[in-house]
Amino acid sequence: MAPTRVTHPPDDGRGEHFRVRIEGFGVGTWDLDLKTWALDWSDTARTLLGIGQDQPASYDLFLSRLEPDDRERVESAIKRVSERGGGFDVSFRVAGTSNAGQWIRARAGLIRDEAGTARHLSGIFLDIDEEKQVEGALRTRETHLRSILHTIPDAMIVIDGHGIIQLFSTAAERLFGWSELEAIGQNVNILMPEPDRSRHDSYISRYRTTSDPHIIGIGRIVTGKRRDGTTFPMHLSIGEMQSGGEPYFTGFVRDLTEHQQTQARLQELQSELVHVSRLSAMGEMASALAHELNQPLAAISNYMKGSRRLLAGSSDPNTPKVESALDRAAEQALRAGQIIRRLRDFVARGESEKRVESLSKLIEEAGALGLAGAREQNVQLRFSLDPGADLVLADRVQIQQVLVNLFRNALEAMAQSQRRELVVTNTPAADDMIEVEVSDTGSGFQDDVIPNLFQTFFTTKDTGMGVGLSISRSIIEAHGGRMWAESNASGGATFRFTLPAADEN
């Protein structure tokens, strides 16, 4: 192909007229002689480069006005175009003048002679400083947004209307095991197990056809799939947006694995507490029954024996039968007493498994069970726990049973109170003990009630059985501690108990 021949048009005044017009728009013009490297530029070009009108134009002067980091790049571009042809389009920053740091864009084309030899590089200078500032602001904003995405604990994934991943946050990388570069461009169904993986494209297609809004903005629990093939429960919320007339969907994903493990642990803990509570209640009731019934049963047996002696001299032909019946009745009365004692002994045989436990951990776990719904009841919870009085020697389940009982009693006592505050503290006590205090702002109780609070079957509640506090005190005393209660001067009640302090070793 023959080289393009471009020559300067004849000077009929129209070229100068055009030059003046574009100069009026802040566009500088310039012309570089590729043989002599002589440079000619307009007044606007001088202004853009920060060069005075009295300074002679030169190629070296032009290069000296560029930032050092840009100078070599611009010079290489000019050399490349002059030798190989093509277009010239570079941006650079002005240095060493009042315009220092200002961005200029240079665009030019080659002018060839009739033989096709490049003679001149002629073009324009454009002020693009404002454009660069906008670009910089956009980059800063993008960096800022990416930094935010890096710190968001929940995974964020953006897909287009065809299910193709467009954005994959750092949290998503950690959660699913795919890097951002690997995930972008793939179908989002790689993050799903079957059958959702095969069906997801049809889900999107149906939504785009029907615009059914039930999937947008509503969180739900689904199953996710990691790169290694393992699955996990996750909470998914989806939002929709439009960009360029095309729909995009943003998914916010939270891993529920730890949450479900915690829930399972709480359910297990609750089951343990329920089991121990039932055994404790049985033991307390068996002890009370043994104490209350043994005397009348013994009296029945004695009366039976006395009645038999009265019949000893009787001539009634049925006397032997009556004596036999009285003997059997006396035996059954004694047997009933033995059954109650055996039941009490059986329940009481459960040995405590005392270990070194963290009191703060016991209180936290017991609070998750005993204080469920407290916030909904507008109860202020304040745990003021001393780390220096944290380790105790205790049976975890039994002490949590005591705490749960106290917490639930406190919530019930504050149900009708205007001010609802529950405070739990722990402090070192004498004789290597640690004292735990549970204080509420409920209805409290009269001083004459206090001596009976811990008696079996005594209750101040309409529906109470009266065994909870009795069991709690028995547990604490079995640990070598003691338990007592006081009325608060400002209303409410405070329960205290002590436990043996433990050593880390």
Curated annotation (Swiss-Prot):
Ranges for domain PAC: 88-140, 209-268
Gene3D superfamilies in alphabetical order: 1.10.287.130, 2.10.70.100, 6.10.250.2580, Histidine kinase-like ATPase, C-terminal domain, PAS domain
Alphabetically ordered keywords of this record: ATP-binding, Heme, Iron, Kinase, Metal-binding, Nitrogen fixation, Nucleotide-binding, Phosphoprotein, Repeat, Transferase, Two-component regulatory system
Activity regulation field: The heme moiety regulates the kinase activity.
Domain PAS: 14-85, 141-208
Ligand binding (heme): 200
Protein's name in the database: Sensor protein FixL
